[in-house]
């Protein structure tokens, strides 16, 4: 019995040792769609000040407005400026998501800069029954992903994965992660930054 137990432990150890260093280190592929890629998308990877051309390609004018407001918010936090660019020379593009991209109950989805097939795309359901404020908070959240942020387990963070309420912040964890990727305009990483719709 002892030999069987030892053999099982050795087999388990061998199988663990043959796995990649970390599942998190494995590259994951971004979703794709029938959209032209943004040719300047790698501007989003710069640590230096960024100048982002943004293509607003949505059929929903309210979403377009709130997305612009969300970009203005990020321009106060990260050392970046943005301008509209309707060409493929954009760095980021807001598109109307298809059912293949936005599964049931998913309102928006961003691509991740570090994943394969990154094209600079953020997809929204233009018919989602959201208020202006909900479009704004969701846009801030999705742009945050493009700037290097992951989901945050704190319900107070705008990067929380579910049900944004309107009193969210960028917390110390969010700001610290942002500072690893980009120059920031905020004075302190310890002071939460309120995400308030203008």
Give short role names for the model-derived ranges.
Residues 1-10:
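Bacterial N-terminal signal peptides that target proteins for export
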Residues 13, 18-63, 109-113, 184-192, ...:
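Disordered inhibitory propeptide/activation segment of secreted metzincin zinc metalloprotease zymogens
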Residues 25, 112, 118-134, 146, ...:
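Metalloprotease/metallohydrolase-associated module, dominated by Zn2+-dependent proteases
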Residues 48-52, 90, 118-120, 155:
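Envelope-exposed proteins and targeting segments
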Residues 59, 87, 99, 163-164:
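Residues that form or immediately flank small-molecule/cofactor binding pockets and catalytic motifs
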Residues 64-150:
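Metzincin-family zinc-dependent endopeptidase catalytic domain
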């Amino acid at each position: 019995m002892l030999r069987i137990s030892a053999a099982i432990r050795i087999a388990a150890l061998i199988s663990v040792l043959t796995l990649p260093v970390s599942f998190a280190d494995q590259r994951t592929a971004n979703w794709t769609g029938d959209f032209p890629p943004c040719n300047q998308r790698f501007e989003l990877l710069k640590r230096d000040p960024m100048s982002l051309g943004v293509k607003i390609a949505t059929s929903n004018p309210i979403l377009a407005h709130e997305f612009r407001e969300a970009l203005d918010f990020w321009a106060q936090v990260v050392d970046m400026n943005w301008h509209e660019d309707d060409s493929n020379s954009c760095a980021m593009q807001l598109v109307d998501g298809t059912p293949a991209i936005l599964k049931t109950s998913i309102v928006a989805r961003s691509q991740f800069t570090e994943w394969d097939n990154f094209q600079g795309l953020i997809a929204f359901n233009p018919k989602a029954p959201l208020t202006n404020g909900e479009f704004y908070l969701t846009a801030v959240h999705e742009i945050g992903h493009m700037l290097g942020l992951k989901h945050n387990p704190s319900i107070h963070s705008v990067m929380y994965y579910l049900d944004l309420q309107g009193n969210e912040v960028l917390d110390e964890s969010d700001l610290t992660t942002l500072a690893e990727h980009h120059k920031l305009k905020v004075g302190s990483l310890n002071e939460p930054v309120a995400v308030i719709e203008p």
